[in-house]
């Protein structure tokens, strides 16, 4: 990726802060379509990428531009507790459990809320097939009880969205070559697609007339090819068969 492309892509703002989960995750719930769930969405690859460093990260955001500018100008990457936890771990980081009530982090979160960033938030670490890393965040201004329920109901959709967005960002930015992606066999692809549609291993083996162990082997083989650790990550890998 050339420096000019990295520079163009490093500060891309998505449109509209009034987001609904139905818009991003295909919710079929009428209440979900009528009531805003999220305040902002943010995607960032702050490190371990050619052309994207801590000082020039790959970002797609709906945060207020004034907050984004202040975040970058004051190098908040270095004190943001969510970024620090997300870099080290694999599990979602709930903002309320990220130690934001201590020291500089408290002032950081209070300042973020003053700029209109949601008071609730969860950040999902993403690990790509070529070792790249990114963080995907959604925020909300709903009360604690509502936010907890939304988070439980929507976590799977948010994980799928996080990995899909990461995959597209890597390809469209030129940081990952499509030709470099692994090719899946027909059976591997079938097992992945059925799993993505919610079928269990027993149901897949009945449809394909193969054993449960064979289904598990095909999924494990696909995970190795895509170099991912979980089936959720696997389902967002390249859909190409031999």
UniProtKB/Swiss-Prot annotation:
UniProt-recorded Gene Ontology molecular function terms: DNA binding
Family designation: Belongs to the autoinducer-regulated transcriptional regulatory protein family.
Keywords recorded for this protein, A-Z: Activator, DNA-binding, Quorum sensing, Transcription, Transcription regulation
Highest taxon, organism lineage: Bacteria
Residues annotated to bind DNA: 201-220
The keyword Magnesium belongs to this UniProt entry's keyword annotation: no
Name assigned to this protein: Transcriptional activator protein RaiR
tRNA processing among keywords: no
